[in-house]
Amino acid sequence: NDYKEEVSLMNNSANLKHYAVFKACKNLEEVYVLYLTKRDDNANNAQFFIEASDYVAQWGDEKLALRIFLNSIETNATDVSILKYIAYKASEKEKHAYALKIYQKILQLKPKEAQSYRDVALAYQKVGKHQRALDVYNGIFNKTYSNVPSFSGVYKSINSEMKKLILKNRSQLDLVGTPSRFLHLKSSSTQARIVFEWNSNDAEFELQFVNPQKKFFKWNHTKSENASRMFKEKEQGFYMEEFLLDGIGTGEWIINIENKTRNM
């Protein structure tokens, strides 16, 4: 297919609306007073806490910014969809230790979901706990977590992530119990690996990948075109898809995403 124009990006009409309100404040004290005034009304709105935290950080008070950010976890302690979003933002801010704690909490709340284990393993890697990460991966491949119906939906990603973990940290790892196919790995040609994650099984969207030659392909995550896939996600508990772009060469790729969720 030939690419002619971009599809519209995922639209969120509430995007940064709280940030704009805080910008009207003249100093940090006013920002914090406004935050306290609005906090209770936004207790279940993680975006409010994150935007408030970001704005406070711009004033140079990192401790207060972190405290506000952590408030978003406290007020949404059992909502997995919101906790996933907060964990994404924590990783984005390179607060990997907090992201790990959130993913561990999600694992406690959703021990039957396949991605709960994968997310914890990846979070362990990001804080340098490579053996702990390997232990989780081994548990997946050795079928230790019998409470999970299946890990087939995340096998592609955990296979890539486990290989990378071992190749980079082999000398530091105890490989006892690791499946034999991971014991004699060799570095292979680099592929562009893109992983998309979302925080709700009901999210409907369309991805469009455009290569430097303006050729494109699409991937739909909608009930009308991919119902069996979405059923599998709910059954196994995963919210992600991995794409490997072979022969990527040089030049710019464009990735568009269009929101297909109704009533948003």
List PLM regions with ranges.
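Generic helix N-cap/helix-start motif at coil->alpha-helix transitions
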Residues: 9-14, 42-49, 62, 76-83, ...
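Canonical positions in the second alpha-helix
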Residues: 38, 71-72, 105-106, 140
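Alpha-helical junction/boundary sensor with strong preference for TPR arrays
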Residues: 38-42, 76, 110, 144-148, ...
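Structural register within alpha-helical repeat arrays
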Residues: 51-56, 85-90, 120, 161-162
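TPR/TPR-like (Sel1-like) alpha-helical repeat modules
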Residues: 108, 125, 130-149, 163
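Intrinsic-disorder/low-complexity signal
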Residues: 165-264
